Amino acid sequence: DGGLGTEETPVSLEQMAGHYKRSKYLAEQEVLKLAKQGLPVVIVNPSAPVGEGDVKPTPTGQMIVEFMKGRMPAYIETGMNIVDVDDVAAGHLLAMEKGRIGERYILGTKNLMLRDIFEILSRLTGVNMPSVKLPRELILPLAYLNLAFSWVTGIPPRIPLEGVKMAKYKMHYDCSKAIRELGIPQTPPEVALEKAVRWFHDHGYA
């Protein structure tokens, strides 16, 4: 509905794009069942972690790498909440120490539009940000074609299908509960992105 997601916002399995997100959702449902039976559970939900040590890299990290390589000719109008991975680690420990049993906490910082993120990356890297905004409806079939091409050639896909699917939802959150109750650090997204860019550069990703 365009509002901010909170710990109480209902979500469904159908909204989860890809096996990774679906598996996390299903695992959380099982944990919630155990919580109702008395298991002392505190749940944390990180937004979009970025920073050092992103070896695979994650979908968000791959987006940064593709930008650094100048392979981001266009963008989709969507939103994300970037959080420093070190703050996420701290948030897990703080949840263990201070979290209330049976509660969940969104670990995040500032809500940004994707264009804002690319503007920050452009300043950090000197790479021109994409100037063309494309509708998700156009990108989605291209992502499927790109995935099929990847299966045939073995070349990793350039258009992340799961990311395009998730772009349907503006991933903006109200993170005040974790700030208020846990005291999670709030490293600015600009700093988190700078750490990610430096790490990817130093380790030969871009």
Where are the predicted features?
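Short aromatic-enriched loop/helix-cap "lid" or pocket-rim segments at secondary-structure transitions
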Residues: 1-3, 54-58, 119, 143-146
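Catalytic helix-loop patch of NAD(P)-dependent Rossmann-fold dehydrogenases
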Residues: 1-43, 48, 72
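Short, hinge-like loop/turn segments at secondary-structure boundaries
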Residues: 3-8, 59-63, 148-151
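Substrate-positioning beta->alpha
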Residues: 22, 26-27, 59, 76-96, ...
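NAD(P)-dependent short-chain dehydrogenase/reductase
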Residues: 38-43, 47-81
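Short aromatic/basic micro-patch
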Residues: 43, 82, 111, 172
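Mid/C-terminal beta-alpha module of Rossmann-like enzyme folds, strongest
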Residues: 91-158, 175, 180, 190-206
